[in-house]
Amino acid sequence: SVGFKAGVKDYKLTYYTPEYQPQDTDILAAFRVTPQPGVPSEEAGAAVAAESSTGTWTTVWTDGLTSLDRYKGRCYHIDAVPGEDNQYICYVAYPLDLFEEGSVTNMFTSIVGNVFGFKALRALRLEDLRIPVAYIKTFQGPPHGIQVERDKLNKYGRPLLGCTIKPKLGLSAKNYGRAVYECLRGGLDFTKDDENVNSQPFMRWRDRFLFCAEAIYKAQAETGEIKGHYLNATAGTCEEMIKRAVFARELGVPIVMHDYLTGGFTANTSLALYCRDNGLLLHIHRAMHAVIDRQKNHGMHFRVLAKALRLSGGDHIHAGTVVGKLEGERDITLGFVDLLRDDYTEIDANRGIYFTQSWVSTPGVLPVASGGIHVWHMPALTEIFGDDSVLQFGGGTLGHPWGNAPGAVANRVALEACVQARNEGRDLARQGATIIRNASKWSPELAAACEVWKEIKFEFPAVDTLDKKKG
């Protein structure tokens, strides 16, 4: 037969193309590749391109029925990782026709599918994606975005304040609603369902939604401010999830919530579409992310999950704290925080950004700082995250010695003091502790909080760090 030669041939003969110039419409991926001993970097990079696009382990005669040159992924550039003996950043370009429009699910099934179990590689990590403008425009993106959210809430010029209700499991709906009310009347903008609060025997979802709505309306009437509680609509089926979102809308509350990784991108995109059509804000929790993103040499970096969320849809997403109890190196964290909020981000190796990314006016997502933070962290958080963020204090509100409402007062006073000091041109990084101490002189609630948490720190080295040359 003409043009078909059976057998196995090296991937690099077809899929390693250093002369290729990436197209504006290509999806570009940066993979951290650790080949097995004896496997050259070109073969490893080509194998990744092949297995995540049109290739398989042997030549097949049906290759002749299509144009492989049109559809194949191409490994077009390889950099050795500084400080590592056998690790490479392999850049792969994928033609846009390989992907279904508006489907994060399909994009990930191709790019981070079977290839991650490939035997020729010891480890593989997807570090970054460049999503082309042509593909971004097939997604709705966040239901509303940062500016529309501020307009809905009538809150400007400062970060928003939140609190996760604790204990996360075990409260009855009535007591849960009471905790929500105390936090909101004390000065918080939002309270939050914990990510694992769905509809358990001790508190069914419908009861929780009702008592939380009552708490919201009561707190709004007392404070004159718009309040919200992230009602977790995550459920065992998509139909049940939408049913819960519909009930939230009927109650007239402003925001619902979804666990986007455990719930899945298909469910998340459906919920985001519903939220846009029905005026609901959508808070996103990233439960399960560390299973995927914590190891430096295998898995997928959170910046990729963040980009995927901006495509799929969400108005808030948890993004680490830099200063609290959960993983997050400052430069890396700020890199993906900007990817969430900004319309255009330049390539920047110092922040782990491998590609220049334009979002063509896709709404931005508010990063949420949450996990082990308290009033002494407020100056650093205000400086690091800026106004367009949500600062969430769970234990840092509910752990106040006088109760929830005073805990909320302490956080609000600390935030307002930091914002005022920043607006006056003071250096929050250097003068933060002084700013908090001065504010506590006229707020007994803040003074009590300062006393409780004055010694608490979570200081461990980050696992996921930038690559630096040895020596």
UniProtKB/Swiss-Prot annotation:
Active site: 166 (proton acceptor), 285 (proton acceptor)
InterPro entries: RuBisCO, RuBisCo_large_chain_AS, RuBisCO_lsu_C, RuBisCO_lsu_C_sf, RuBisCO_lsu_fd_N, RuBisCO_lsu_N_sf, RuBisCO_lsuI
UniProt binding sites for substrate: 114, 164, 168, 286, 318, 370
Molecular function GO labels: magnesium ion binding; monooxygenase activity; ribulose-bisphosphate carboxylase activity
Keywords: Calvin cycle, Carbon dioxide fixation, Chloroplast, Disulfide bond, Lyase, Magnesium, Metal-binding, Methylation, Monooxygenase, Oxidoreductase, Photorespiration, Photosynthesis, Plastid
Cofactor(s) needed for function: Mg(2+)
Positions of modified residues (N6-carboxylysine): 192
Compartments in which it is found: Plastid, Chloroplast
Site (Transition state stabilizer): 325
Binding site for Mg(2+): 192, 194-195
Sites bearing N6,N6,N6-trimethyllysine, chain numbering: 5
Co-factor binding details: Binds 1 Mg(2+) ion per subunit.
Entry-linked CDD domains: RuBisCO_large_I (cd08212)
Highest taxon of source: Eukaryota
Subunit structure of this chain's protein: Heterohexadecamer of 8 large chains and 8 small chains; disulfide-linked. The disulfide link is formed within the large subunit homodimers.
Additional free-text comment from the UniProt record: The basic functional RuBisCO is composed of a large chain homodimer in a 'head-to-tail' conformation. In form I RuBisCO this homodimer is arranged in a barrel-like tetramer with the small subunits forming a tetrameric 'cap' on each end of the 'barrel'.
Protein name: Ribulose bisphosphate carboxylase large chain
Species this protein is from: Schlumbergera truncata (Thanksgiving cactus)
